[in-house]
């Protein structure tokens, strides 16, 4: 959180990075640093906080850790300075043209590529990919943004400027933007991929990697994501009760 190289959203937090890494190692989970700022310049590469995080997370133990990246400048720097990482091409690139996306998938730099969510249902095009290309695709499942938005790239660039401490606020003009994120709204989005679609459509097509957005939305929404995507329906109520009755958990 609060990193110069960050993008996608502005985040703040005070959790201990070493403790987070230790927890992920305990459960065998690959960590990813989200460094998707699209407007980085040469002078930003020496940022101490971001480099310290890279030095810490590059040593992933049994699980290799990764970096989600937008800037090719940062990508080249990270490949040279921290070769232990794998790299993920960020959805903040807003690649809505399928041939542009195909070119991104074909780049050897990336283990995974996250398409713009508006390509999620482009099944005729997805069917043209080879097996190894499908292995590199990671779908963003639960985007809530307006499907017809034309300013998505500008919105991400505004976040990048904010992380750099530069002016240039973006005011979203999309329908319903003032209401903020709602999972119920995301489920009605034409690009939404629910757990049934993962199981019945995408897995049979050879796609096995999926991304859930919303890490900064608060525990209550994160709980709903985890219930929908990672918990069998018959356990939903029992899990909710356990968490609601845990008075040390800040859900709201």
Protein language model features and the residues they cover:
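Active-site pocket-lining/capping segments in soluble small-molecule metabolic enzymes
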Residues: 1-100, 104, 110-252
């Amino acid at each position: 959180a609060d990193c110069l190289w960050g993008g996608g959203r502005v985040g703040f937090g005070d959790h201990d990075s070493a403790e987070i890494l230790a927890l992920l190692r305990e459960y065998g989970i690959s960590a990813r640093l989200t460094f998707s700022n699209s407007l980085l310049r040469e002078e930003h590469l020496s940022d101490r906080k971001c480099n310290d995080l890279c030095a810490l997370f590059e040593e992933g133990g049994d699980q290799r850790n990764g970096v989600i990246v937008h800037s090719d400048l940062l990508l080249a720097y990270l490949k040279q300075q921290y070769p232990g990482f794998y790299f993920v091409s960020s959805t903040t690139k807003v690649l809505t043209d399928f041939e542009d996306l195909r070119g991104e998938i074909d780049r050897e730099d990336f283990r995974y590529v996250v398409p713009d969510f508006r390509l999620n249902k482009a099944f005729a095009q997805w069917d043209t990919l080879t097996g190894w290309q499908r292995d590199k695709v990671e779908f963003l499942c639960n985007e809530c943004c307006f499907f017809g938005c034309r300013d998505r790239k500008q919105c991400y660039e505004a976040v990048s400027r904010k992380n750099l401490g530069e002016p240039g606020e973006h005011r979203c003009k999309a329908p319903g933007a003032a209401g903020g994120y709602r999972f119920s709204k995301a489920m009605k989005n034409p690009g939404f991929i629910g757990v049934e679609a993962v199981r019945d459509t995408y897995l049979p097509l050879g796609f096995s990697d999926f991304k859930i957005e919303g890490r900064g939305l608060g525990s209550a929404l994160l709980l709903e994501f985890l219930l929908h995507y990672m918990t069998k329906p018959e356990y939903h109520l029992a899990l909710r009760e356990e968490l609601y009755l845990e008075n040390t958990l800040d859900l709201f």
